[in-house]
């Protein structure tokens, strides 16, 4: 599986992403569609985080959920 593409796993984890980052809209989720870089970017945009802070949140989320892109 490509590092930036979650493929089928994305459908399983979409709800967990929305739980973690409730400010993400359904349109955001469509844009993200399993692409890690898009998730980091949308977290930056919606929460006003710097890239490193958004990246850290995603890494923490991946670890907690045993999610691999």
From Swiss-Prot:
Q: Name one Pfam family in it.
A: CsbD
This protein's GO cellular component annotations are: cell pole; cytosol
UniProt lists the family membership as follows: Belongs to the UPF0337 (CsbD) family.
NCBIfam families registered for this protein in UniProt? PRK10428.1
- UniProt name for this protein: UPF0337 protein YjbJ
> Which organism does this sequence originate in?
Escherichia coli (strain K12)
Q: Give the gene name.
A: yjbJ
């Amino acid at each position: 599986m490509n590092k930036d593409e979650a493929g089928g796993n994305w459908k399983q984890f979409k709800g967990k992403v929305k739980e973690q980052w409730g400010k993400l809209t359904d349109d955001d989720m469509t844009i993200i569609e399993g692409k890690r870089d898009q998730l980091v970017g949308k977290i930056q945009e919606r929460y006003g985080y710097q890239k490193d802070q958004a990246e850290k949140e995603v890494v923490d989320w991946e670890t907690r959920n045993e999610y691999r892109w």
